C-alpha cells in the first residue's frame, strides 16, 4: 500500500478574516477562519493551510490568535504561511499551534534561512512554497522552462523553479508546496508538466496547488507525482466537496484517508 494522498483546503486570511468569500450554508460567520476550519475538518480534510495575506505588521498578532483558536478546536494538521521571515516568526506560529510553517519570498532572498529553520525546528515543520510559472516571452530563459515568481506571480525571481525546489530539499525542508501561477484561478486543471519535473527532481513530498476546477482534475495531479492536493476557491464555493475529490482519487486507483 502506498501512502494516502492528502486533500488540503487553503484559506487566505487578512487581518483575521477569510478573504476569498466562502459559501457554506449554516455558518454563523463565513469570514471566521476557525468556523471554516471546523467545517473542513468535519468534511474530511486531511490538513488545512492558512495563508496570511495581511500586509500590515499588526496583522501578525491577529494571525497568531486565529492559529490558537483553530488549534484548540481542530485536530488535523495546520500549515501557516505568509510573511514568515525569521526563526522567531516560526517559533511563534508553532507555539500558537501550527504544525508546519511555509516559507516563500524570504527564502529566495536568503536561502540559508531554510537550513536554519529545519535545524532548529525539524524538517517536518518546514514547507518551501514555490510560486512557479512558465518563463514568459522575453523572460530570462531557465533550463526547465519554469521560473520562480514573487509578489503573487507578478515578478520573476530569475530562478529556475525545478532547481529551487531541489535546493530547498538540500537545505532541509520537509515538503514542497508547488503553486502553478499559470494555473492559479483558471480551473483548467493542475500544471502536470511542472509537477512531473519537480517530482523527478526531489524525493520529499510535493503538494500540488493552482488550477483545480473539478474533481476530475485531481487524479492526474496525483499520477504526475503529487503526494497532496490543495485547492481554495472550489472548496469554499462548494463547487466540489472534499468527499468528491477523495472519491475521484480513489476511483483512479490511489489510496486516500477515509
Curated annotation (Swiss-Prot):
Keyword Transferase: no
Pathway connected to this protein: Amino-acid biosynthesis; L-histidine biosynthesis; L-histidine from 5-phospho-alpha-D-ribose 1-diphosphate: step 5/9
Active-site residues, as the UniProt record annotates them: 12, 131
Keyword Cell wall biogenesis/degradation: no
Keyword annotations of the record: Amino-acid biosynthesis, Cytoplasm, Histidine biosynthesis, Lyase
EC number: 4.3.2.10
Subcellular location per the Swiss-Prot or TrEMBL entry: Cytoplasm
One of the protein's GO biological processes: L-histidine biosynthetic process
Cellular component aspect of the GO annotation: cytoplasm
InterPro entries for the chain: Aldolase_TIM, His_biosynth, HisF, IGPS_HisA/HisF, RibuloseP-bd_barrel
One annotated GO molecular function: lyase activity
Gene3D superfamilies associated with the record: Aldolase class I (3.20.20.70)
Catalysed transformations (reactions): 5-[(5-phospho-1-deoxy-D-ribulos-1-ylimino)methylamino]-1-(5-phospho-beta-D-ribosyl)imidazole-4-carboxamide + L-glutamine = D-erythro-1-(imidazol-4-yl)glycerol 3-phosphate + 5-amino-1-(5-phospho-beta-D-ribosyl)imidazole-4-carboxamide + L-glutamate + H(+)
Class of the enzyme per the UniProt entry, highest EC level: lyase
Role, per record: IGPS catalyzes the conversion of PRFAR and glutamine to IGP, AICAR and glutamate. The HisF subunit catalyzes the cyclization activity that produces IGP and AICAR from PRFAR using the ammonia provided by the HisH subunit.
Family the UniProt entry places it in: Belongs to the HisA/HisF family.
Subunit structure: Heterodimer of HisH and HisF.
HAMAP family linked to this entry: HisF
Name of the molecule in the record: Imidazole glycerol phosphate synthase subunit HisF
Gene from which the chain derives: hisF
Amino acid at each position: 500500500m502506498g501512502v494516502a494522498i492528502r486533500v488540503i483546503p487553503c484559506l487566505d486570511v487578512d487581518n483575521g478574516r477569510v478573504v476569498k468569500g466562502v459559501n457554506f450554508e449554516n455558518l454563523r460567520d463565513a469570514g471566521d477562519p476557525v468556523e471554516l476550519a471546523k467545517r473542513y475538518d468535519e468534511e474530511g480534510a486531511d490538513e488545512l493551510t492558512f495563508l496570511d495575506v495581511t500586509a500590515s505588521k499588526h496583522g501578525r498578532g491577529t494571525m497568531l490568535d486565529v492559529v490558537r483558536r483553530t488549534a484548540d478546536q481542530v485536530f488535523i494538521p495546520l500549515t501557516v504561511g505568509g510573511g514568515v521571515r525569521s526563526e522567531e516568526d516560526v517559533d511563534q506560529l508553532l507555539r500558537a499551534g501550527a504544525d508546519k510553517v511555509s516559507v516563500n519570498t524570504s527564502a529566495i532572498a536568503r536561502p540559508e534561512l531554510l537550513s536554519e529553520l529545519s535545524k532548529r525546528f525539524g524538517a517536518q515543520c518546514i514547507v518551501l512554497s514555490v510560486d512557479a510559472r512558465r518563463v514568459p516571452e522575453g523572460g530570462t530563459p531557465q533550463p526547465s522552462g519554469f521560473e520562480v515568481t514573487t509578489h503573487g506571480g507578478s515578478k520573476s525571481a530569475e530562478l529556475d523553479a525545478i532547481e529551487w525546489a531541489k535546493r530547498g530539499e538540500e537545505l532541509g525542508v520537509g515538503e514542497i508546496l508547488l503553486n502553478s501561477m499559470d494555473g492559479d484561478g483558471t480551473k483548467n486543471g493542475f500544471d502536470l508538466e511542472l509537477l512531473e519535473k519537480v517530482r523527478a527532481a526531489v524525493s520529499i513530498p510535493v503538494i500540488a496547488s493552482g488550477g483545480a476546477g473539478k474533481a476530475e482534475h485531481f487524479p492526474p495531479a496525483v499520477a504526475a507525482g503529487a503526494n497532496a492536493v490543495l485547492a481554495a476557491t472550489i472548496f469554499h464555493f462548494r463547487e466540489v466537496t472534499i468527499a468528491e475529490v477523495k472519491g475521484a482519487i480513489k476511483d483512479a486507483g490511489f489510496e486516500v484517508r477515509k
